[in-house]
Amino acid sequence: MVKLLDTDIKTSEVKNWKGINILHFKGSSCSQKLRIFLNEKKIKWKSHHINLVNGDNFSEWFLGINPRGIVPVLVDDGEVHIESNDIIKYLD
């Protein structure tokens, strides 16, 4: 499981997010896999679209959430998790 340490999260606003929040890109196969899982399990989640084409994943804001600059990212009540397979295991 890839859960970021609190000290790794530089975009502090996400530490206050409540519920299941997914940062994703519509064309990312890993994001698509996670969205399918969430819908199959009927898990309610809030969408935060990250435009990879425009390079949003390399913005200071996004890198402050995930220093690897990849999607999807799960923020669950302020805890940040990355890597789609690990996120699915965590939520299942």
Set out the residue ranges of the language-model regions.
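GST-like domain detector, emphasizing the conserved glutathione-binding G-site
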Residues: M1-D92
